[in-house]
């Protein structure tokens, strides 16, 4: 999970974890993955599939920001002006999700809650309608499939929508998955494939002669590795022992999320993900196949604070109620908050970084679940060959350094 409630500007300290059978021991592997969220896990699973020996260090594998996420696979409806470069990566990953889900479900022997249900983005007033029309035009310029619907057509698709809905975009290719089930399945698949889990927090990176050679864990274990992968999410830049020049430009972006339950008497409540911009804030409602309804999410620059606030809950319920008034009758079963790993350009940092022996898989911001298949594919390639595949090169962990060099040359 993202962590206990905390406030202030300092990152959370490494958790004290119980010693286990391997505590204080030595371990060696081809690859050491620091962080057992979905990005670290998919990296480990794909790497071991390439014949590499892999250790994952994390006190609670399968946790992280994805435990809070809604799990939208929204490459089309999440397209923002100025982020067109990210579109190709998002689409590649979205198009690979069906086969990835089938492969992972077979490997883990459990479902992921993957649903090919589509998404409906709606407008509540004239300004929202104009903004949605602009998004539709952006889709058309990029050859993306979305269909404009009138308010009446939107309500015909989703009868629970408010009468005031003015129009919408139907995107049948934007699906969803349950991130909690995804994390559980990845842990199981990794274990079955032979990944060595060390359930302890990472104390510090180990560096020798200017090269990353592994890490020390909070329980005293020392892990040596040919390549170490930094996959610590929003905390990736805070790792002890990481030289300043090798710290990725990642910051925490807080998101609060609500989980409601749809009783059988109210089912079916929504058949697909519904989203909108209300009062300049994005809100979405994601119906799970198990009767859960996820409402999210705030986007807050609050440092390391993961407190669920009355204001955050109020804003989410208020905005969601404007879309679907009937949700006020549903039981509220969970409130939670997590920290997305944000980057200056909202795009992930992948592959070899400035420190030899260290590769990076972080900075996925709001697209971590969507980009799980593509990240696993890219990191498996870079761990096997030393370089990213061509299609992932624009998201190199070195791109900020390379851009700074180009800027200095121009200056």
Residue locations for each model-derived region?
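Active-site substrate-recognition segment that forms the wall
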Residues: 42-49, 59, 71-72, 110-114, ...
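Helical element adjacent to the flavin cofactor pocket in flavoenzyme catalytic cores
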Residues: 169-219, 223-225
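Short hydrophobic core segments
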Residues: 32-34, 223-235, 376
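Dinucleotide-binding Rossmann-like beta1-alpha1 core, especially the glycine-rich loop
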Residues: 72-153, 157
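Extreme N-terminal leader/targeting segments of oxidoreductases
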Residues: 1-30, 49
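N-terminal Rossmann-like FAD-binding beta1-loop-alpha1 element of flavoenzymes
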Residues: 29-55
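C-terminal catalytic lobe of FAD-dependent flavoproteins
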Residues: 324-411
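Helix-loop-beta segment of a Rossmann-like dinucleotide-binding subdomain
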Residues: 110-123, 135, 142-193, 298-302, ...
């Amino acid at each position: 999970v993202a962590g206990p409630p905390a406030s202030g500007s300092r990152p959370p300290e490494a958790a004290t974890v119980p010693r286990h059978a391997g505590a204080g021991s030595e371990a060696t592997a081809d690859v050491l993955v620091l962080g057992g969220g979905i990005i670290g896990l998919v990296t480990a699973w794909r790497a071991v599939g390439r014949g590499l020996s892999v250790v994952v260090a994390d006190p609670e594998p399968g946790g992280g920001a994805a435990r809070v996420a809604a799990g939208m696979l929204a490459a089309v409806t999440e397209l923002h002006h100025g982020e067109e470069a990210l579109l190709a990566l998002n689409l590649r990953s979205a198009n690979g999700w069906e086969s990835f889900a089938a492969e992972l479900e077979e490997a883990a022997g459990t479902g992921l809650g993957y649903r090919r249900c589509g998404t409906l983005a709606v407008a509540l007033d004239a300004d929202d309608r104009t903004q949605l029309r602009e998004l539709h035009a952006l889709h058309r310029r990029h050859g993306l499939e979305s269909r404009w619907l009138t308010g009446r057509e939107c309500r015909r698709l989703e009868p629970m929508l408010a009468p005031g809905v003015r129009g919408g975009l139907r995107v049948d290719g934007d699906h969803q998955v349950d991130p909690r089930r995804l994390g559980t399945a990845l842990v199981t698949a990794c274990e079955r494939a032979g990944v060595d889990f060390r359930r302890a927090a990472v104390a510090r990176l180990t560096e020798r002669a200017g090269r990353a050679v592994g890490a020390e864990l909070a329980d005293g274990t020392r892990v040596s590795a040919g390549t170490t992968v930094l996959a610590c999410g929003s905390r990736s830049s805070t790792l002890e022992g990481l030289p300043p020049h090798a710290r990725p430009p990642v910051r925490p972006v807080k998101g609060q999320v609500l989980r409601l339950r749809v009783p059988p008497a109210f089912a079916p409540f929504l058949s697909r993900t519904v989203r909108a911009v209300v009062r300049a804030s994005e809100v979405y409602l994601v119906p799970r196949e198990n009767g859960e309804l996820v409402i999210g999410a705030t986007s807050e620059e609050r440092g390391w604070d993961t407190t669920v606030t009355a204001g955050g809950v109020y804003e989410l319920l208020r905005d969601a109620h404007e879309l679907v008034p009937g949700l006020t009758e549903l039981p509220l079963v969970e409130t939670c908050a997590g920290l997305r790993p944000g980057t200056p350009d909202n795009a992930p940092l992948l592959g070899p970084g400035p420190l030899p022996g260290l590769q990076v898989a972080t900075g996925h911001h709001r697209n971590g679940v969507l980009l799980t298949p593509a990240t696993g594919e890219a990191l498996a390639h870079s761990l096997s060959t030393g370089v990213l595949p061509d299609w992932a090169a624009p998201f190199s962990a070195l791109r900020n350094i390379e851009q700074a060099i180009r800027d200095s040359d121009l200056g």
